Amino acid sequence: MPNLTGKVAIVTGSTKGIGLAIAERLVNEGASVVVSSRTAEEVVAVAARLGERAIGIACDVADPAACQALVAETIKRLGRLDVLVNNAGAGIIKPISELTVEEWQIQIDVNLGGVFYLSKAALPHLSASGDGFIINIGSLAGRNPFGGGTGYNASKFGLVGMTEAMNLDVRHDDVRVSIIMPGSVNTAFGGGEQKAERSWPLEADDCALAVMQLLEFPKEAHVSRIEMRPSQPPRG
């Protein structure tokens, strides 16, 4: 595992599921972690549970001003930023005939807009760290379309392209950008999993381990994406 002592990370959508598992791993490896989601009470409670190296800052990633405020408060309280994990997501699975304009827009605003707003605000600080990393949590729905996925697939396909284009933009500024694309994960989030995988999904900590693997690579190496799917049914 990487030694993250002295590093500072923001993890969005980190009060439960994949985001919480990532935050726990980061803290365990020595990082200071900003736990973030839309609900102030939840982020404070989760941060307290994670211990003295975690703080909670609420943020609606669909709001550009809130994203700027999240980064500014992180720098004010922790002094630096080394890792940004864009995990917050929205998934509304409906055929296009039933999907409303508002439901379409929230998926675009959170799954694409939030990544753009927060990454843009964080980039100067990530570059200043000398070894910054943006890790976007995507989905296999970003390469495998399915019925009912008009909005969700569009946002996740777009996130793959955004990740790779962003990396080309910032690779000479001491920042790497990668995406982790899991299949079905055993969490409360219900967007975009294929039925064939739902009977034996990945665990949230599998995704957290993938984050640790990316952070363990030397800065001279870049893994653009990690695709994850269950290799076998659970035992027992």
Q: What is each model feature region?
A:
Residues 8, 15-16:
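Conserved glycine-rich cofactor-binding loop
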Residues 40, 59-70, 101:
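The beta1-alpha1 cofactor-binding region of Rossmann-like NAD(H)/NADP(H)-dependent oxidoreductases
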Residues 119, 155:
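Active-site helix of classical SDR
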Residues 29-45:
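Conserved glycine-rich Rossmann-like NAD(P)H-binding loop of the short-chain dehydrogenase/reductase
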Residues 139:
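Residue(s) in the substrate-gating loop at a strand-loop-helix junction
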